Amino acid sequence: MVSIIKTCRRFEWPVDFLSVISDRPCEGIVKARDLGVNGELLDREKLGKDVFQAELFKKITTYDPDIVVLAGFMVILDAKLFSRLFNVMINVHPSLLPEFKGLNTHQRVLNENVRKHGAS
């Protein structure tokens, strides 16, 4: 997330970062704020799955973004609820999907001696 913000700024791309939203307390919110970007917490554990997803959808649509980037976001979103946003969402995943989806991606790649690895 920090790299995305810094790269866009370094190349002076016409991008406004509206918010960084996390589902758990994390350093990403602090780093976003340090870069002058709104950092928000929607605590998934406290809200529960359904309320969390509804609140996240409401928050995102309130911003009316041109693009939504999911980076380091370890939640499978409700397809029905988020279908309206699918054409503006990018999910950055640390593997060449569909291989090695889920947690511990890099360790599993190493354990299986895979020669080719990347991001989707």
Model-assigned labels for residue ranges:
Residues M1-S120:
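One-carbon transfer enzymes
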